[in-house]
Design a protein with these regions (language model features):
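Nucleotide/phosphate-binding site architecture used for ATP/NTP-dependent chemistry
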Residues: 2-462, 491-639
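Short loop/turn and capping residues at structural boundaries
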Residues: 153, 482-483
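Short, well-ordered beta-to-alpha junction loops that form the rim of enzyme active sites
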Residues: 337, 483-484
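Conserved kinase catalytic-core helix
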Residues: 456-475
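Catalytic-loop of the protein kinase fold
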Residues: 476-482
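Hydrophobic residue at the +6 position relative to the catalytic HRD Asp in the kinase catalytic loop
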Residues: 486-488
Length: 639
């Protein structure tokens, strides 16, 4: 009879070896403190920008109070257009609420600042010797932020997961801005580590384990093989762009070896290969969602595991989209992944995927036919094909949920073969990137180009702000031009054009203009002022607010000059196309203040209903438009 000790500790011959625990990122104490301070600085900046916090002057800085009115945190900041707060990370401190017996503030460990009980510890530490804690700030300010008890644990988890992602990046070597300015798109993409400029919890990837992050997170840059499944064709949707038929789709997206091997797997399973289509799957998704969650489909052989593909792929910033590193000129593959990040489960809906190629073809056509967009070097990256499996019980139930977004994929053309000789590319996120020494990549591009800061900024706006505005003004069409959906075309660091991508879910036609059959879902008719938010919120507040401050605070370009150049670029468009400006006014004095973090705090796992995004949005009054100052005198200056 085996005793209890033997049962608890089986021999090496019989026990299953467990993986070694993953070690925490190797940050020294000061780097760990700096990480906390950077998160806190962004938190106080963006939460103040969204008017959830109301900073009060206090000495050389500002304090924010909890729901009782007691000051809890102190920071120093400069203020900029669009109510941007540029918070000094080294100044952030949690306030010691203690008082001495005489009712005066205690000065233990730091210098007192005006106000009863307000003590700011000196030297970068709190009174107990620790660094400030971003999660503690959320706890202190929970009621002020409107964060419910139900959502609090989810947001704290998301915030910690974001910090884990940041810590992993900071523990690894990284190139300088000057080095990155001479790098190609895949390398630039790997080292863009700022995350979304507005969201505080911006790269949580909740559900992706620590060891899994080492394998599949974009910053790891580890090449991986995708898992391939065969899905019964009668239970699947396959949509192809105008350039493809079934034969060309298979030839383009599978190697000859994969085609032969996958067909052999199906024949060996007693199945007819012609009755199946193939789906690329993230290895994490197969292990965590499909095999355990869709086992009946596997047992029925409605889904058949084909194995790994021949090519190696690398995850991009969006986590679920892959670049083919074996042949970077081949299409990107976008896969479903049941991980929560920045307010959404990163799955893919077969129903949504079905229309993607048609939407992409339509958008590609209207931009190619537009002389102005061609002049500006704008090109839509077409989504050549999509596939989705709908034979599972969740689809049969008729209930729409995240469980119906588990198995689908999309192929999108790569920008690399579309670059002209001498051009290189980088995600728009690069203009907001700074290296470990605080040097902006934008500054390094300016230096490489040999242009002045004014000339470079004007060129950037000519291929970003103005084309997005032109699409809205001339085509009643709004895209989501955030920093991942735009890829800049650069020549020696100088902007000469842009690729637009990933627009099937993030494009909207805002009028009753005719649309091709099958893509009516992208129509979202709104009033003129709400239409303007496609520029005011998504471009001015979402991207250019941060860029203007970055260039200003690093001494590259004064922010007043930045906004003057932006106004001038739009004013010249208005002169050329006055007929497009009759209904919309991008120079209006103010616009509705749409708030992203308010959405995330309301529900960290489902910020908006993608089928009804407009009604999901949250507003906090109005923002003054920095373009309005130059309404009547934008002309002249930099050309």
């Amino acid at each position: 009879m085996t005793d209890l000790g033997q049962r608890q500790h089986p021999t090496d011959d019989t026990r299953r070896t467990a993986p070694h625990p993953t070690r925490a990122p190797g940050l020294d104490r000061e780097t760990a403190r700096a990480l906390q301070r950077d998160v806190l600085a962004k938190m106080f900046s963006e939460f103040s920008h969204e008017r959830m916090l109301t900073p009060e002057p206090c000495g050389d800085g500002w304090t924010v109070a909890d729901a009782s009115g007691a000051p809890r945190w102190y920071f120093e900041a400069t203020r900029h257009p669009l109510e941007h707060w540029e918070v000094d990370p080294d100044s952030v401190h949690r306030i010691d609420p203690g008082h001495g017996p005489d009712g005066r503030p205690r000065e233990r460990g730091g210098a007192a600042v005006p106000g009863p009980g307000v003590v700011v510890p000196a030297g970068g530490r709190e009174a107990d010797g620790t660094a400030p804690d971003a999660q503690q700030a959320v706890l202190d300010l929970q009621d002020v932020l409107g964060l419910s008890d139900e959502m609090l644990p989810l947001y704290l988890e998301d915030l910690s997961a974001t910090m884990f992602s940041m810590a992993r990046r900071r523990a690894a070597p990284a190139p300088t801005a000057a080095e990155l300015a001479h790098s190609e798109l895949p390398e630039v993409e790997r080292f863009l580590d700022r995350g979304h400029p507005g969201f505080v919890a911006s790269s949580g990837r909740v559900g992706l384990g620590a060891a899994e992050a080492e394998a599949w997170a974009p910053e790891a840059a580890e090449p991986t093989a995708l898992t391939w499944l065969a899905a019964r064709r009668s239970l699947s949707t396959v949509s192809l762009g105008v350039e493809l038929d079934d034969e060309e789709h298979v030839r383009r997206h599978l190697t000859a070896g994969e085609r032969e091997r996958f067909r052999a797997v199906l024949r060996d399973a007693g199945e007819d290969p012609d009755e199946y289509t193939v789906i690329p799957v993230h290895p994490w998704q197969w292990e965590h969602r499909i095999l355990p969650g869709m086992l009946p489909d596997v047992l029925r052989r409605d889904l058949v595991l084909l194995g790994e593909g021949d090519h190696l792929w690398r995850a991009q910033q969006s986590l679920r989209t892959f670049l083919d590193v074996t042949d970077p000129h081949r299409d990107y593959a976008k896969t479903a992944m049941g991980v929560h990040s920045m307010g959404f489960l990163r799955g893919l809906s077969p129903a949504y995927m079905r229309a993607m190629p048609a939407i992409s073809d339509w958008l590609y056509a209207i931009t190619e036919e537009d002389e102005f967009l061609r002049e500006r070097g704008i090109r839509v990256l077409r989504e050549h094909a999509s596939v989705g499996y709908t034979g599972d019980a969740h689809h049969r139930s008729g209930v729409r949920s995240d469980y119906t977004k588990q198995l689908a994929a999309l192929w999108r053309e790569s920008p690399l073969p579309l670059l002209a000789p001498g051009e290189h590319a980088a995600s728009l996120a690069g203009v907001l990137h700074t290296d470990r020494a605080g040097r902006p990549l934008a500054g390094a591009w300016i230096e490489r180009s040999g242009a002045s800061a004014e000339e470079w900024v004007r060129a950037l706006l000519d291929v970003y702000l103005v084309p997005v505005a032109h699409l809205l003004l001339s085509q009643d069409t709004a895209m989501m031009p955030h920093s991942e959906n735009v890829i800049l075309r650069l020549r020696d660091g100088f902007p000469v054009g842009a690729f637009w991508k990933d627009l099937g879910e993030e494009v909207a036609v805002l009028s009753n203009r005719p649309l091709p059959e099958g893509i009516e879902r992208i129509r979202a008719v709104t009033d003129p002022e709400e239409r303007e938010l496609a520029v005011h919120t998504d471009v001015l507040d979402g991207v250019l607010r941060h860029l203007a401050v970055l260039l200003h605070t690093t001494g590259i370009l004064d922010e007043t000059q930045f906004w003057r150049i932006a106004a001038q670029s739009l004013d010249e468009h208005r002169e050329r196309f006055p007929e497009h400006w009759r209904e919309l006014d991008l120079f209006r004095e103010s616009f509705a203040h749409s708030c992203l973090n308010r959405l995330q705090l309301r529900n960290p796992q489902r910020m908006v209903d993608l089928a009804n995004q407009s009604e999901s949005l949250t507003y906090a009054g109005r923002l003054e438009n920095p373009l309005a100052t130059f309404r009547n005198h934008a002309r002249g200056g930099v050309r």
